[in-house]
Amino acid sequence: MSCILTALCKKGQANLNSLIKLQNKKVKNYYVKNNETAIDKMLCIAADIKGQVEQLELVNQYLGAPESEKLDFVYDCSDLDINEKDLKSLCLTKNIAYFTQKYNAPTVLKAQAAVYDSFIKHSELFINAICQMDEKQQVNNFCLDELVKLKLIAIKHLCALEYVIENSI
């Protein structure tokens, strides 16, 4: 079993537990104080939870998977819903405008500044993970589990930014 993926799983579970506790606290405060601004914060936390759950489901799937499955996972980018040319371009430019344009974020999230900031944060973190993955793929002696980990991190952030767009007011 992979130490890298096991550590990612443990860290992810701890992070998910913290996010759920934080979400419960925000929901309780929302109803006690009837604070409308808390809605945006709850959406951001819910997006983080969604991304973390997706990552945990996949890390458990690949934890004991054979190398051939892991290689397929790492090199098949269809699950990212971004073509390979655009991924390469993102790594070269690190331009988050790709996501803001793709999801029309400035318009969709116009009235929700905190949610837009969360969208931008997840876009940047996705690009960072994909770029790290691309750099490590260029090395002859790469660690496959490290590549799986980086793709799982990218998926977590992609799910979170998509959740924000799909569930904004």
UniProtKB/Swiss-Prot annotation:
Q: Name one Pfam family in it.
A: Pkip-1
Highest taxon in the source lineage: Viruses
The record ties this protein, via InterPro entries, to: Pkip-1
Tell me, in a sentence or two, what this protein's role is: Plays a role in the stimulation of the viral kinase PK1 function in very late transcription and in expression of genes required for budded virus production.
The entry describes its oligomerization and partners as: Interacts with protein kinase PK1.
Report what the protein is called.
Protein kinase-interacting protein PIKP1
Recorded source organism is: Autographa californica nuclear polyhedrosis virus
Taxonomic classification: Viruses, Viruses incertae sedis, Naldaviricetes, Lefavirales, Baculoviridae
